[in-house]
């Protein structure tokens, strides 16, 4: 009996290592919005992060020998961000451990990673509709004319234009007409990393790369919110990275494996992003014609 328990314990450690490795890799490659925005680590012992925001200042012409006529007031507003725990639990039976099947452990890890990535990404996507500025409307087309206008307005109003994110079915409407025209352009250096590059549509309009995210949900009118923003418009606050916890359940003859993280998604600067409400109906009919 002692020998069996030792074997099971060793298999559990091996299983945990495989699952966590696969979960981390899968998560990193399945949350495009999280990879596009600023990541901030919360210092140990701190409950929340306070970010001061100072209003735009104006520089003035000076006259030699004369004092400044104008002075700028510093009246910062504060954006506060907090984190909360998010996790997932998997019950691993002794029988599964005895089989010692690495493929099964890898599949479990992938599913755990996909679940955590989906949770983080949808938390970040939920910020899109909260921006004060919004372009588009229900059933409006995500086409070249409309999105070119969005970019022009965003630049005119000093809204961030580091990236655009929308649902693949919205971007699909534009892709066939502009790929040949814009295919020679490349991504900015800041986004030249695998987890982000994988979600680039291949389109860049007026210097703004367009990314796809299938986690964006639609409303009853087949429309949904994307975003045009700078990296610092939204933030991903990390209070604690992945931690693994195990608890033995003898009646189940199994071990509960719990993965927990503590993080928060927050809007850092309302003036640096805008919501994009555009249509993305099912492409099934067009794809089969």
Regions from the PLM with identified roles:
Residues 1-76, 234, 287:
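N-terminal "assembly arms/tails" that initiate or stabilize quaternary assembly
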Residues 59-62, 100-101, 173-176, 266-268:
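Short helix/loop capping segments that flank catalytic or ligand/cofactor-binding pockets
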Residues 77-99:
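Short acidic, glycine/tyrosine-flanked loop/strand segments centered on an H-E-D-like triad
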Residues 93-160, 276-289:
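Alpha-helical scaffold segments that mediate packing/assembly in large oligomeric complexes
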Residues 100-107, 223, 245, 249:
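Short alpha-helix boundary/capping segments
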Residues 145, 152-239:
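Extended oligomerization regions of viral-like shell subunits
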Residues 241-289:
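Extended, compositionally biased alpha-helical segments that mediate assembly or anchoring
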């Amino acid at each position: 009996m002692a020998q069996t328990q030792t074997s099971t314990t060793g298999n559990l450690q091996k299983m945990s290592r495989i699952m966590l490795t696969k979960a981390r890799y899968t998560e990193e490659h399945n949350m495009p919005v999280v990879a596009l925005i600023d990541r901030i680590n919360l210092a140990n012992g701190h409950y929340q992060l306070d970010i001061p925001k100072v209003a735009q200042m104006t520089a003035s012409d000076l006259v030699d020998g004369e004092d400044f006529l104008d002075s700028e007031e510093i009246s910062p507003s504060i954006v506060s961000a907090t984190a909360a725990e998010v996790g997932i639990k998997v019950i691993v039976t002794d029988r599964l451990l005895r089989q010692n099947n690495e493929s099964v452990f890898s599949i479990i890890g992938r599913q755990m990673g996909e679940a955590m990535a989906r949770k983080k990404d949808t938390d970040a996507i939920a910020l899109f509709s909260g921006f004060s500025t919004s372009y588009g409307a229900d059933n409006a087309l995500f086409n070249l004319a409309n999105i070119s206008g969005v970019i022009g307005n965003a630049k005119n109003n000093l809204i961030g234009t580091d990236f655009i994110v929308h649902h693949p079915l919205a971007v699909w409407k534009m892709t066939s007409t502009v790929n040949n025209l814009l295919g020679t352009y490349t991504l900015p250096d800041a986004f030249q990393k695998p987890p982000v590059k994988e979600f680039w549509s291949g389109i860049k309009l007026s210097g703004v790369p367009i990314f796809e995210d299938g986690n964006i949900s639609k409303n009853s009118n087949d429309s949904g919110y994307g975003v045009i923003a700078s990296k610092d418009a939204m933030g991903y606050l990390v209070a604690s990275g992945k931690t693994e916890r195990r608890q033995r359940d003898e009646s189940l003859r199994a071990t509960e494996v719990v993965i927990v993280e503590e993080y928060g998604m927050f809007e850092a600067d309302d003036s640096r992003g805008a919501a994009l409400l555009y249509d993305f109906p099912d492409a099934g009919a067009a794809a089969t014609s």
